[in-house]
Amino acid sequence: ENTPLLRASRALSKAGAFVAGMESVEKFQEVNTVAVDANGLYPVGSVELHSIKSFAQSRIDEAILDAASLMVRVDGLLKDIFLEMIGGNTRILKQVDQVAYYDRAGLCAEIDGKTVLIGSRTLMEQFNISMPSKDYEKKFVRGDREILYLANSGEVTAMFVLSYRTSPDIERWLDVLARREISLVVQSTDPNITEARIAKDYGYPEE
């Protein structure tokens, strides 16, 4: 019986993983980088929507449906929040085409033949969209709260005020990776998930 391997397998099984054998151990013992999706760091229930502010005479239900359609299309962090807001009815989701991600800014897509953006103020400004003042933003951003904007056809339609919670289980595993000096590569379509946020939330080194 390979006792060390057995102990490792038992520990990993609690996280839904396993070691296939000593060959796998030898193959991965020199790993120095781990790639993970943002959903792995902020699992279901980690993101809280505090409020929605609508603009441009837009119907808030249409804004939510646009956001839900895009988040489901890209499996975004906010997917479950918006699905819950439409009662989990995926049949009413709109067709989403030509999705593009702008690094550290957000997403652009075609929905119902119109250009829809969801992301940061930076993304909106890249598309020359008129924005609420930063003083207006400050009324809603306090503590760890963040903002994402939704725009449709060149106009801001909604502002979402969000916060992100950490997971104790994820924190433990990231601590193991950090102590072993394993680099973390995070794939995210949410501009609020940055190196600085991960470092602040989980104590994982930025470099």
Per-segment meaning from a language model:
Residues L49, A56, T122, S163-Y164:
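A generic structural motif
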Residues K53-R104, E125-K138:
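ATP-binding catalytic core of ATPases
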